[in-house]
C-alpha cells in the first residue's frame, strides 16, 4: 500500500517539524529517502554529509531486541543516499546540537507500532489512505519509478540485494 504524490504531499504538510527529533521527523526522512524503519532509527548526526548532500546508511538499530546498533540487513544495504536540498536545509537545523555518534531517533525502547500510529493519525488528518512506515518506503520507490528512474537505480537507493525485490 502506498500514497500517490498528492497524497504524500498532503500528509507531509501535516507534520510538525518544530522542536527536536520526533516521529514526525523520522516519517519525513523515510518518505524522502525510502529507508527501512531500522535504518532510520540507526541514523546518527555523523551519517549526514551536508556538503555532498548524502546520507550514509551503514548500520541499523535493533529495536526488536531492546536497542543497540547492528549491521544492515545485507551487504547491498550499506549505501549512500542522495538528499534533496530542501531536506538538507531542514536537517541541518535539527542535527546541529546533537551528539555526532548517538542515534537521532532511538531513545529508550522503540516500537514501530508507535511510529505507525503517528503516521496513521497524519494520514487521517488530511484524508488520505492510512499506510505504515514501511508503506512510505513503497511510496518512495513507486514515485521514483513513476518519474522514470530506472529499476536498477531505485534498487540501489533502497539497498535491495536484487532488482527482483524492487520489482515486486
Feature-to-residue mapping (PLM):
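Short basic/aromatic active-site micro-motif
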Residues: 22-24, 108-112, 129-148
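C-terminal catalytic core of tyrosine-transesterase DNA break-rejoin enzymes
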Residues: 2, 28, 32-39, 121, ...
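Short functional hotspots where side chains directly engage DNA or cofactors
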Residues: 52-57, 106, 132, 143, ...
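Active-site/catalytic core of tyrosine-dependent DNA strand-transfer enzymes
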Residues: 2-8, 60, 84-129
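Conserved tyrosine-mediated DNA breakage-rejoining catalytic core shared by Y-recombinases
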Residues: 5, 42-93
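Basic, Lys/Arg- and aromatic-enriched nucleic-acid-binding interface segment
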Residues: 1-43, 51, 97, 137
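Exposed loop/turn and edge beta-strand positions of beta-sandwich/beta-sheet ligand-binding modules
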Residues: 23, 51, 77, 99, ...
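Short, contiguous acidic/charged loop-to-helix segments that flank catalytic cores in large enzymes
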Residues: 15-18, 68-78, 104-110, 127-135
Amino acid at each position: 500500500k502506498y500514497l500517490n504524490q498528492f497524497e504524500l504531499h498532503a500528509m507531509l504538510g501535516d507534520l510538525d517539524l518544530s522542536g527536536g527529533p520526533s516521529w514526525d521527523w523520522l516519517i519525513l526522512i523515510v518518505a524522502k529517502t525510502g529507508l527501512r524503519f531500522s535504518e532510520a532509527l540507526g541514523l546518527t548526526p555523523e551519517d549526514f554529509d551536508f556538503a555532498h548532500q548524502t546520507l550514509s546508511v551503514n548500520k541499523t538499530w535493533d529495536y526488536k531486541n531492546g536497542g543497540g546498533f547492528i549491521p544492515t540487513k545485507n551487504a547491498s544495504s550499506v549505501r549512500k543516499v542522495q538528499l534533496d536540498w530542501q531536506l538538507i536545509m531542514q536537517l541541518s537545523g535539527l542535527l546541529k546540537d546533537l551528539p555526532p555518534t548517538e542515534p537521532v531517533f532511538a531513545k529508550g525502547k522503540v516500537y514501530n507500532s508507535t511510529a505507525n500510529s503517528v503516521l496513521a493519525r497524519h494520514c487521517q488528518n488530511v484524508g488520505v489512505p492510512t499506510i505504515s512506515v514501511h508503506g512510505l518506503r513503497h511510496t518512495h520507490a513507486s514515485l521514483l519509478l513513476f518519474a522514470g528512474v530506472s529499476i536498477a537505480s531505485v534498487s540501489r537507493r533502497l539497498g535491495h540485494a536484487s532488482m527482483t525485490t524492487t520489482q515486486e
